[in-house]
Design a protein with these regions (language model features):
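Histone-fold modules and their flanking histone-like tails across chromatin and transcription assemblies
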Residues: 1-24
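A broad, low-specificity signal marking well-ordered, structured residues that form hydrophobic/aromatic
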Residues: 6, 31, 82
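Alpha-helix C-cap/termination motif
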Residues: 23-26, 53
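Short, surface-exposed connector motifs at secondary-structure boundaries
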Residues: 26-32
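C-terminal edge-of-domain segments
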Residues: 60-98
Length: 98
């Protein structure tokens, strides 16, 4: 099972859209976007831009969770996580006009 992983951070959203498109050009079975904390909204935006502008038939699964991270002075913090799995259907095509 082939998959590509795109880690979402603080870059502009179109950088991640480009990474997703590049990943799909290698014909993986799925592309996974992973993000934590404040980057979660960027991951959702990148997935939606890719789905609405570039692929007409892209399906997604979303998994959310929490990770414990050690912070300053040994304290633990809870950080939200998201994993968005994008799959391209075999009949998926680029929308006309793009």
């Amino acid at each position: 099972m082939s998959e590509e992983v795109v880690y979402v951070g603080s870059k502009p959203i179109l950088a991640y859209v480009t990474a997703i498109m590049t990943s799909f050009s290698r014909n993986p079975e799925k592309v996974i976007l992973r993000a934590r904390g404040r980057a979660i909204s960027s991951a959702v935006d990148a997935a939606e831009v890719t789905r609405t502008r570039f692929f007409s038939d892209l399906t997604s699964e979303i998994s959310i969770g929490t990770e414990e991270m050690k912070g300053e002075e040994g304290r633990t913090r809870n950080v939200s996580t998201i994993e968005i799995t994008l799959r391209k259907s075999p009949e998926a095509k680029k929308p006309s006009g793009s």
